[in-house]
């Protein structure tokens, strides 16, 4: 091989290996972690996540997006030509905030995240809540009896013989559900009487509000939702112990052989889909934000409602599901954009993390950090 050819090959190889880079200085965050030589400062440690990389950065982005939800005011937008005089008023525009939808699965209420949810609802930091049947019943049951820490590896057959139910590494004594039945059946009795005598048409959200009223316990997020008039939607109300109780009650008050004559307690789901979609449709001038923990029913129900207004403006998903099986749980925000459930220019992120880890940290750096602002009544348009 001649010298000229050798150098030509080397130049060609070097040009490939050492390809000239685009300059990222100033346009991208530099990756660096927290310096513990500065001592232990948890606020600074959390702030450093955005520059740490991987899911730490996604959590940092989620914190930033939620803070954008909380900071947004209509005054940040220019008035449209057709807006009313009231809508042009500076004070009015400053009072209009982002409408926040919070969705979560039942296991998070089984866990200590229930107390984080209760804090948000207690202080009116969210506007609409969507959960599963377990997310309703577990909140109520915890007012009657505790859930305990167990272990993921405890054998099911042994636990069954002891009357202990396992949720991951949590243990729920079966007696808790007996206490739940003793508490809730008389409430259903009263609701049935109101249905017959006062022609009350119950929807899942009305049932949930009533249960929040009856439990009358400040540790319950449903109690605070009732007190603060925050709607809690659960289209799958029958899927869980709550459904078991409704099933038992249907034999007590209804006539299984003649359901057309006496169906027992009736719950109208159509009324709630109108109410839920209306929360998005009638958001009016407000932007909407979605914070969704876990997947499945709550995730889709919140996203689908926001489709009715051409998509949410902010979205934070926190779950460990993957998109490769085509599940809604695993779908990234961009898939929701294709359906019109999230707007094309929306601020979005998915944090691939157990919500029991990520969500309390997120709340600490967002809602809780701005708690004084929530002492004032948030605008309801």
Curated annotation (Swiss-Prot):
The keyword Oxidoreductase does not apply. NAD(+) binds at residues 106-110, 132-134, 138, 239, 295, 320-321, 354-355. Induction: Up-regulated by osmotic stress and chilling. GO terms for molecular function: deoxyhypusine synthase activity. GO terms for cellular component: cytoplasm. It holds the Pfam family DS. GO terms for biological process: spermidine metabolic process. It is an enzyme of class 2 (transferase). Keywords: Hypusine biosynthesis, NAD, Transferase. Spermidine binds at residues 137-138, 244, 300, 326-328, 335-341. Belongs to the deoxyhypusine synthase family. Catalyzes the NAD-dependent oxidative cleavage of spermidine and the subsequent transfer of the butylamine moiety of spermidine to the epsilon-amino group of a specific lysine residue of the eIF-5A precursor protein to form the intermediate deoxyhypusine residue. Also able to produce homospermidine from putrescine. This is Deoxyhypusine synthase. The lineage of its organism: Eukaryota, Viridiplantae, Streptophyta, Embryophyta, Tracheophyta.
């Amino acid at each position: 091989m001649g010298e000229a050819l050798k150098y030509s090959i080397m130049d060609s190889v070097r040009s490939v290996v050492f390809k000239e880079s685009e300059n990222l200085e100033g346009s991208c965050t530099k990756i660096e972690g927290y310096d513990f030589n500065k001592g232990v400062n948890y606020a600074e440690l959390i702030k450093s996540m955005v520059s740490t990389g991987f899911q730490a950065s996604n959590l940092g982005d989620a914190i930033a997006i939620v803070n954008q939800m909380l900071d947004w005011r209509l005054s940040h937008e220019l008035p449209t030509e057709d807006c009313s005089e009231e809508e042009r008023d500076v004070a009015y525009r400053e009072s209009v905030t982002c409408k926040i939808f919070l969705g979560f699965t039942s296991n998070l209420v089984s866990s200590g995240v229930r107390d984080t949810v209760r804090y948000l609802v207690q202080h009116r930091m969210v506007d609409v809540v969507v959960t599963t049947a377990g997310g309703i019943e577990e909140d109520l049951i915890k007012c009657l009896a505790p859930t305990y820490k167990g272990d993921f590896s405890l054998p099911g057959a042994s636990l069954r013989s002891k009357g202990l139910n396992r949720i991951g590494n949590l243990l729920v004594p079966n007696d808790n559900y007996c206490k739940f039945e003793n508490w809730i059946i008389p409430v259903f009795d009263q609701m049935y009487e109101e249905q017959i005598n006062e022609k009350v048409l119950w929807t899942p959200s009305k049932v949930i509000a009533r249960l929040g009223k009856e439990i009358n316990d400040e540790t319950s997020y449903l109690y605070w939702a009732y007190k603060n008039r925050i709607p809690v939607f659960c289209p799958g109300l029958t899927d869980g112990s709550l459904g078991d109780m409704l099933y038992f009650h249907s034999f007590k008050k209804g006539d299984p052989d003649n359901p057309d004559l006496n169906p027992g307690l009736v719950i109208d789901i159509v009324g709630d889909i109108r109410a839920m979609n209306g929360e998005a449709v009638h958001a009016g001038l407000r932007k909407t934000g979605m914070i969704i923990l876990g997947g499945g029913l709550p995730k889709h129900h919140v996203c689908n409602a926001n489709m009715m207004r051409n998509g949410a403006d902010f979205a934070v998903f926190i779950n460990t599901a993957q998109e490769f099986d085509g599940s809604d749980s695993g779908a990234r925000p961009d898939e929701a954009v294709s359906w019109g459930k999230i707007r094309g220019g929306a601020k979005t992120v998915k944090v691939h993390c157990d919500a029991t880890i990520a969500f309390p940290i997120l709340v600490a750096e967002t809602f809780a950090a701005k708690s004084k602002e929530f002492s004032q009544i948030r605008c309801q348009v």
